[in-house]
Each structure stands twice: as structure tokens, then as C-alpha cells.
């Protein structure tokens, strides 16, 4: 497959690989990351947002059935939902991820029993957390060092 940015059909261009014609596409999903011809990762972030919500619903039902400390709930979130939210962020982490950050902030606002209008700074400060953007930056730096070394 070949990425093609323009809508114009190129009739005379035909690319072959092992005597097979390669298709022109606007987006392609590789290992769960949607690669787009225009370079944005909105579809990736949207699908990760939806998948993380699917992982969050069973977690919330466990919280309703069993009384857990906040630290245990955070540990469960970090082990079950956070990997989904940050999947492939070494590649797409340069872009803003508003939907992904919203899952994180909504979880902690619900966990701390504060209103949705509460400042995110206060919400992150109470449990000693950072926005997911910081975690994505750390993952990108670690990945870069891994590639270099």
C-alpha cells in the first residue's frame, strides 16, 4: 500500500512489489496505530479513547462492588487503562490528545468526588499525578534513547 495525499487519480502511475500492484490509500492501521497520509493521528487517538472507555467500565463496576483505597484504585487504573491510553504514544505522542486526557481527568475527578468544573491543577495535585502529556513525553524520550543506543 502507498499513501496518497491528493484525491486526484493517477492513472499512469503503477507501483509493483514482488510483481503485485500496490494500492493507494489515505490511511492504514498498523499494529493498532492508524497511519494517515496527512500525518495526523486523530483516528488513533479516537480509537484509543473508545478502547480505554471499554476498559474503564469493568473497573468502575469493581469499584462499586469492593471498597478499595484510592491508591489501589489508582494502581488498577495505571495497570488496566493507562496502557491503552498511551499505546503507541512514542509515535503519535507529539500531537495533542484531548480525548485521551479527558478520560484521565474524568477518572480522577470521579475518584476524588469533585465536580467536573474543578480545576485540573487541583485535581492532579491532590493524588500527586501529572497530565498524560508528561507520561507521553517520558515514553518518547525513553524510546528515542532506545533507538540511539
Task: Report residues per predicted region.
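Short, conserved micro-motifs composed of acidic
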Residues: 1-26
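Non-catalytic, peripheral interaction segments enriched in hydrophobic/basic residues
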Residues: 1-6, 28-149
Amino acid at each position: 500500500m502507498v499513501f496518497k495525499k491528493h484525491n486526484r487519480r493517477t492513472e499512469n502511475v503503477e507501483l509493483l512489489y514482488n510483481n503485485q500492484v500496490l494500492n493507494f490509500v489515505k490511511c492504514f492501521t498498523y499494529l493498532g496505530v492508524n497511519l494517515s497520509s496527512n500525518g495526523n493521528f486523530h483516528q488513533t487517538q479516537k480509537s484509543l479513547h473508545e478502547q480505554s472507555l471499554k476498559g474503564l467500565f469493568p473497573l468502575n463496576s469493581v469499584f462499586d462492588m469492593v471498597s478499595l483505597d484510592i491508591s489501589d484504585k489508582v494502581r488498577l487504573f495505571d495497570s488496566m487503562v493507562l496502557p491503552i491510553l498511551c499505546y503507541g504514544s512514542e509515535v503519535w505522542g507529539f500531537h495533542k490528545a484531548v480525548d485521551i486526557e479527558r478520560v484521565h481527568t474524568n477518572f480522577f475527578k470521579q475518584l476524588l468526588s469533585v465536580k467536573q468544573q474543578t480545576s485540573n491543577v487541583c485535581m492532579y495535585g491532590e493524588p500527586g499525578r501529572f497530565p498524560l502529556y508528561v507520561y507521553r513525553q517520558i515514553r518518547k524520550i525513553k524510546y528515542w534513547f532506545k533507538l540511539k543506543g
